[in-house]
UniProtKB/Swiss-Prot annotation:
Species in which this protein is naturally found: Pseudomonas putida (strain ATCC 700007 / DSM 6899 / JCM 31910 / BCRC 17059 / LMG 24140 / F1)
Protein name in the entry: 2-isopropylmalate synthase
Xref: SMART domains: LeuA_dimer (SM00917)
Cofactor(s) annotated in UniProt: Mg(2+)
Residue positions binding Mg(2+): 42, 246, 248, 282
Function: Catalyzes the condensation of the acetyl group of acetyl-CoA with 3-methyl-2-oxobutanoate (2-ketoisovalerate) to form 3-carboxy-3-hydroxy-4-methylpentanoate (2-isopropylmalate).
Catalyzed reaction equations: 3-methyl-2-oxobutanoate + acetyl-CoA + H2O = (2S)-2-isopropylmalate + CoA + H(+)
The keyword Magnesium appears for this protein: yes
Amino acid sequence: MTMLKDPSKKYRAFPTIDLPDRTWPSKTITQAPIWCSSDLRDGNQSLIEPMDSEKKLRFWKTLVQVGVKEIEASFPSASQTDFDFVRTLIQDGHIPDDTTIQVLTQAREDLIARTFESLRGAKKAIVHLYNATSPSFRRIVFNQDKQGVKDIAVNAAKLFVKYAAQQPETQWTFQYSPETFSATEMEFAKEVCDAVIEVWNPTPEHKIILNLPATVEVSTPNIYADQIEWFCRNVSRRDSVIISLHCHNDRGTGIAATELGLMAGADRAEGCLFGNGERTGNVDLVTLALNLYTQGIDPLLDFSDIDGVRKVVEECNQLPVHPRHPYVGDLVHTAFSGSHQDAIRKGFAKQQDGELWEVPYLPIDPADIGRSYEAVIRVNSQSGKGGITYLLEQEYGISLPRRMQIEFSQVVQGETDRLGLEMTAQQIYSLLHKEYLQANAPYALVSHRLQEENGHSAVEVEVAGEGETTLHWRGKGNGALEALVAGLPIAVEIMDYNEHAIGAGTNAKAAAYIELRVAGGRPVHGVGIDENITTASFKALFSALNRSLSQQEAKAA
């Protein structure tokens, strides 16, 4: 079977919402929503191998540490394991006073009773009721009409009131989800929710939660936002209701749908860390939170050690986080492209502490989430001088002059093309060392003696020449380097000279860079590093001289 030439024969677009006076497009998110993690319930039930109790507890502690204040821990009536986990959390004191446990139940009395029993002794708890309301579920799954579906919700809501009254020591919050809300007729979704509200009788001081799931994404995010705004306008007792979002990612727009839903008036967001969940996953709470953070809004969640959080999630879920996953993937703060690397390097050079973050290609400072800058720039065959320069500066304190950056990038490019692999900072430095610092033939500097005479410099150098010969060159000039050039037996023109310190204090070294031409040839660069700046400059000159002569010899051959 292949894709249809006319998909309209099999699929149809989801209808839009008639909301010409919608207001959400002109709004912005100005504060973090109430966060609820469903990792231990919705996320766990979607795993190939669900978490055992030990992993669940480890995950719970991570969520608490991050700052999630409402955590859906399990489906207590589904299994003894889930029931026992809730009991462990309560009896062993794993629920902080500022954190609320949430559990889920279907709309059957035996399951509801079991769910409330699992929460006995909890200081406070959210009990989450759901039943599907969309036309396809009514027709295909339940064979129920609208009244039948509404009756299921209302009868279960009454049972919530009954069983909660038997445990008055717990501060209860009731939550109702018209499952498949986004595929349900809005008038009917409102009708069912209004009926549940009537039973639970919330007040502004004691609110209930209405959770409005995009159980399966069926439309573009703007339609979901229209649904949320319409619902917020029309639901009864809006001031006594917390509107919650629960988006999945079937169309790849769960983040956008949630953000637009918050703009449309929602108060709360349910999801999972890094987007685990059924099928394509629940909305990713980490991305939502850090999207707020990068807009200057406190997300009320702490991902200062994002790699530590990822490690727990990967080990508990036994699923890897994609290397391109926003904010946390191994490659999301990495640039291979030469133009990107150059822009990032320049951005880092200009960025000052306390200023607004404006480094090109990096929407967040990796350091804010516990990332180092070491992986920001990596070098492969697509890389340019910016990335190479950045790595040498950051790892080895070597700042190549601009024209030398261009020359050395060609050397690196040739090596990456030859290897077909990425190069590390250490490999790049080794290549620099081999190409420039070990350029000792045909002339190797052995020693030098410098004297100042009447404001002029006199230099004598001992040089190891070809065939184990020892040469002595002498010259005078206005400075040490000019004196050395004057003493060379070859016509050399210095085009550019740069120097800087590597490190600080007594262990500091000097780096010198020379660009020269030999006998009117093309410019060539050399590098010298030494504790003594004069020695470093002499080494740089010999480096450039030898490289130029070797290139001329190779060209002649």
